[in-house]
């Protein structure tokens, strides 16, 4: 089954972390990143992982815990008390139709613009609701976590059918942007931005899960939030089923022909020409991940797989098919047979590619150019100069050097890139300006 993987991205310079709201967490991420310059896997390296708000949840009794924060939030909203204690501060990230509120600022020198998340204070949000004649209620807010360093609690809210003026007044420099666009616009070496991207991905996944779990699947009654929106339960007293946020595991595998030093890459029926990537598919109930790798590979290409070796995993909250969050679980899969029979209902093409061909695709891809294009698009949107078009139509994904590379492969924000590059360049740490924090398949 197809999982959409886009191309692109990444300049090499690290920017400072002056805007990062969680200095100690940022430091720990920095350490993790610097420690990963060897060929070991850096679990913070994948886009949408390394969320600084997910590293620790406060225990019950802590004033920043979900229950205590919810109580404080309830008091401030229901009492309309604007003069209450400023501690803790509440920061809310609004979403509209799955798009987070964002801003953009100029980069330094020749570097691309830098996007940021559009956090709003509680009083500002309440004012925006009041101006629109909408009611801000506690149940709309979903707890993301807190930060003791800045004494703040972070929330997300879906404002899709409310407060229409939010994001439309470009004087404020704020607009709602597709998460995929932000993903491509993110400088992969900027840990602050990578952390922000992960926060937005987590928030988007939680809000989408809330949207489609409004009714109990057992009795049909309405569900209500629990634990400040981190869980839900059925409102029917005779049912009371608990409902947990949904994660869908997807296997993604680079199938390797050891004998002939080739890798199997497939082209999905999509508009992005020349894009070849790893095979992938959802796991079935009752199936192990390794079994899913073998089954999907056989179904889509007729190749039989023997050994299956885990590589790394990546949260993927930007799938196009209304699934809140897939967990991409990456593997190397070693082929036992080599003859390809393409399932034309799933794939347009599948071929064995030599290591040399794959190296060319990685070497001549213009990831940095694509990142700049997306970052400039976000800047234009926040100025009100461009509408939110689909990503595929914006990006010149054919920008890879066709003279030197016959195919293009997904960019560094996709786990497919890391599977492919760690096989193709198993002897190098940096490829085309992108740091490879990946396991060498020859070491497995
Ligand atoms: Zn129920």
Q: Where are the regions that the model predicts?
A:
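Nudix hydrolase/Nudix homology domain
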Residues: 2-8, 12-15, 19-22, 28-213, ...
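Short cysteine-rich clusters marking metal-coordination/redox-active sites
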Residues: 216-219, 234-236
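N-terminal strand-loop-strand
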Residues: 227-228, 232-278, 310-311, 333
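Short loop/turn microsegments at loop-to-beta-strand junctions
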Residues: 250-251, 289, 348
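Short, catalytically relevant binding-site loops at active-site mouths
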Residues: 270-272, 283-285, 315-317
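The catalytic Nudix box helix
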Residues: 277-312, 331, 336-339
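Acidic pyrophosphate-coordinating catalytic loop
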Residues: 314-326, 339
């Amino acid at each position: 089954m197809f999982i959409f993987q886009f191309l692109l991205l990444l300049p090499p310079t690290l920017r400072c972390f002056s805007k990062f709201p969680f200095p100690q967490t940022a430091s720990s991420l920095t350490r993790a990143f610097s420690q990963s310059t060897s060929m070991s896997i850096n679990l913070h390296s994948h886009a949408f992982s390394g969320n600084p708000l997910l590293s620790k949840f406060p225990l019950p009794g802590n004033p920043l815990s979900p229950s205590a924060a919810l109580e404080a939030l309830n008091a401030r909203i229901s009492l309309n008390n604007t003069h209450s204690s400023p501690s803790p501060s509440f920061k809310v990230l609004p979403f509209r139709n799955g798009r987070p509120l964002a801003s953009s600022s100029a980069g330094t020198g020749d570097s691309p613009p830098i996007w940021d998340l559009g956090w709003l204070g509680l009083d500002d949000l309440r004012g925006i609701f009041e101006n629109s004649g909408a009611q801000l209620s506690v149940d709309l807010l979903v707890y993301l976590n807190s930060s003791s360093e800045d004494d703040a609690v972070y929330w997300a809210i879906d404002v899709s059918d409310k407060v229409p003026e939010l994001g439309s007044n470009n004087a404020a420099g704020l607009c709602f942007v597709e998460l995929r666009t932000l993903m491509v616009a993110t400088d992969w070496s900027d840990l602050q931005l990578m952390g922000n991207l992960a926060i937005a991905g987590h928030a988007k996944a939680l809000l989408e899960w809330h949207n489609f779990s409004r009714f109990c699947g057992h009795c049909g009654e309405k569900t209500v939030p629990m634990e400040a929106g981190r869980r839900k339960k059925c409102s029917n007293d005779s049912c009371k089923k608990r409902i947990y946020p949904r994660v869908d595991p997807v296997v993604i595998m680079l199938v390797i022909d050891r004998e002939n030093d080739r890798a199997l890459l497939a082209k999905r029926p999509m508009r992005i020409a020349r894009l070849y990537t790893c095979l992938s598919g959802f796991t079935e109930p009752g199936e192990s991940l390794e079994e899913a790798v073998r089954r999907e590979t056989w179904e889509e290409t007729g190749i039989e797989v023997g050994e299956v070796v885990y590589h790394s995993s990546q949260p993927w909250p930007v799938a196009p098919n209304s699934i809140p969050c897939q967990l991409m679980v990456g593997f190397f899969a070693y082929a036992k047979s080599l003859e390809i029979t393409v399932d034309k209902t799933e794939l347009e093409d599948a071929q064995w590619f030599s290591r040399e061909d794959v190296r060319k695709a990685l070497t001549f891809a213009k990831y940095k150019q694509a990142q700049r294009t997306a970052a400039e698009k976000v800047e234009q949107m926040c100025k009100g100069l461009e509408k939110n078009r689909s990503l595929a139509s914006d990006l010149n994904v054919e920008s890879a050097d066709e003279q030197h590379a016959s195919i293009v492969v997904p960019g560094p924000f996709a786990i497919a890139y890391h599977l492919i590059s760690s096989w193709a360049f198993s002897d190098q740490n940096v490829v085309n300006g992108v740091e490879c924090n990946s396991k060498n398949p020859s070491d497995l």
